[in-house]
Amino acid sequence: NTYGYELTGGEKEMTCMNYYTNEPIKIPLDSQLTSRENAQKYFDKYNKLKRTFEALTALTVETKEEIDHLESISTALDIALKEEDLMEIKQELTEYGFIKKHGPSGKKVKITSRPFHYLSSDGFHIYVGKNNYQNDELTFKFATGNDWWFHAKGIPGSHVIVKCEGKDLSDKTFEEAGSLAAYYSKGRGNEKVEIDYIQKKNVKKVTGAAPGFVIYHTNFSLVAEPRITLTEVLG
């Protein structure tokens, strides 16, 4: 109790220095309590407020993560073309508690849909995930370390993988892959979208995170028009 020696008992307030403003500040006291008891009262109040702040901070982070997750699912819905695509999205919504389960619990829908597959002007194969499950499959099971990974910067969107097969990508292929990443993202309606790209070996899965969520650090980016200029490879 730094200022306890200045109190004689029965005071209703005390004046001390605010070290942040260098101005005196008056602190209300309970005249029925001793200086030590008043100090303990404020200390307990501080601890309670600190716990509340920490709980609210954690809740804010959790809510932000859920919003990001739902926005990524919303983007996948915009992409979905077939019933099997919708079934995979429904499975994700159920698995993460956004919709209630019906029927036997624990039964998962087998992932049967395939990613979009394009061929670049220079002959490189480009794959685009249709939903978060596919994004995980593409990035962490299908792609090899030196393949190139593209994603719209800071917004929900598909993982785009360019298979290198030991070759250097042409500028044209970078541009075409960037356009696909822009088109299959929340930024589809914009004139331009900033796209991050990096070799797949530098993309890491976050332990315990929802499917499709990754961490990476790159200084490589390009600005692309959200459009499809390539023909899809079917089959």
Regions found by a protein language model. Name each.
Residues 1-235:
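Extended, highly charged segments
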